Amino acid sequence: MSDENTTHFGFETVNAADKAERVAGVFHSVAAKYDLMNDVMSGGIHRLWKKFTIELSGVRPGDRVLDIAGGTGDLTAKFARLVGDEGQVVLADINDSMLKVGRDKLVDKGFLGNVQYAQADAQFLPFPDNTFDCITIAFGLRNVTDKDMALAAMNRVLKPGGRLLVLEFSKPQNSLLEKAYDLYSFNVLPMMGKLITQDADSYRYLAESIRMHPDQQTLKGMMENAGFAQCRYYNMTGGIVALHKGTKA
C-alpha cells in the first residue's frame, strides 16, 4: 500500500478510500445507544466539556452556526436556543443513522424553525463560502480521513472573523493520568460497549482512534496551516479532552 493512499483506522493502516465506510459502520452500530454510552463512559462529564464549548463560542442571537459531526444534537440544541428565531443552526453529520437519531431527538424537544439537517462530509462541505459565524466539531475530527482538508473546508465556509471550535479527546498532561486513561480506554471501554451496545469492537476503535489523534500542539499547528488565526487550546480533565479555538482572518 502506498503511504499516499493510506490512513489510520484506529491502529490499523487502511486504504484512505475505505476509512469513511468503516467509520460509518461503527456509528451505524452505536447510534441508538450513543447518548447513553457518552454518559456512562464519561460519568456525565461530557456535558461540562460541551457547556464550556458553548460558552467560548461567542454565539449570539441571529448567528448562523454549523455543528459538524453533530450526531445526536447536544450542541445543536443549545445553539438553537442562543441564535433564536432570526438565527440558524445546521446539524451536519456524514452518518445517516446518527443524523436520524439527532433529528428525531430535536423534533421531539420542539426544535423546528431554526434547525436544519445535512448529511455531509467534513472534507467536502456543501455550503457557499463565508456562510457561518461559528463552526463546531465535537468528538468528530479524529474520525475524518483527511483532517487538513476538513479544516480548510471549515475555514472556507466561515465568515471572516468567524470562529472554529474543535472539541476532541487529546493527550493527558500527566504521565500517571495517561497510564490510568490508557488502562480505562483499552480495557474498560470495550467491556462497557459489549454490555450496553453488544459491540466491543466499536469502542475498541474509539480507544485506538483517540490514541492516534494529533496532540494539542500538533492540532493547533494544523489549524494555523489551514488559515486560522488566534489559535489556542484549553485542556480539560487533565488534557484528556482539549478545546481548540481559531478565528478566520
From Swiss-Prot:
Name of the molecule in the record: Ubiquinone/menaquinone biosynthesis C-methyltransferase UbiE
UniProt key word S-adenosyl-L-methionine: yes
Organism: Teredinibacter turnerae (strain ATCC 39867 / T7901)
PANTHER family: 2-METHOXY-6-POLYPRENYL-1,4-BENZOQUINOL METHYLASE, MITOCHONDRIAL (PTHR43591:SF24), METHYLTRANSFERASE (PTHR43591)
Any GO MF annotation of the entry: 2-methoxy-6-polyprenyl-1,4-benzoquinol methyltransferase activity
Reaction catalyzed: a 2-demethylmenaquinol + S-adenosyl-L-methionine = a menaquinol + S-adenosyl-L-homocysteine + H(+); a 2-methoxy-6-(all-trans-polyprenyl)benzene-1,4-diol + S-adenosyl-L-methionine = a 5-methoxy-2-methyl-3-(all-trans-polyprenyl)benzene-1,4-diol + S-adenosyl-L-homocysteine + H(+)
Record keywords, A-Z: Menaquinone biosynthesis, Methyltransferase, S-adenosyl-L-methionine, Transferase, Ubiquinone biosynthesis
UniProt-annotated binding residues for S-adenosyl-L-methionine: T72, D93, D121, A122
Function: Methyltransferase required for the conversion of demethylmenaquinol (DMKH2) to menaquinol (MKH2) and the conversion of 2-polyprenyl-6-methoxy-1,4-benzoquinol (DDMQH2) to 2-polyprenyl-3-methyl-6-methoxy-1,4-benzoquinol (DMQH2).
EC number: 2.1.1.163, 2.1.1.201
Alphabetized InterPro entries for the sequence: SAM-dependent_MTases_sf, UbiE/COQ5_MeTrFase, UbiE/COQ5_MeTrFase_CS
SUPFAM superfamilies named in the record: S-adenosyl-L-methionine-dependent methyltransferases (SSF53335)
Pathway: Quinol/quinone metabolism; menaquinone biosynthesis; menaquinol from 1,4-dihydroxy-2-naphthoate: step 2/2; Cofactor biosynthesis; ubiquinone biosynthesis
GO BP of this protein: aerobic respiration; menaquinone biosynthetic process; methylation
Family, as annotated: Belongs to the class I-like SAM-binding methyltransferase superfamily. MenG/UbiE family.
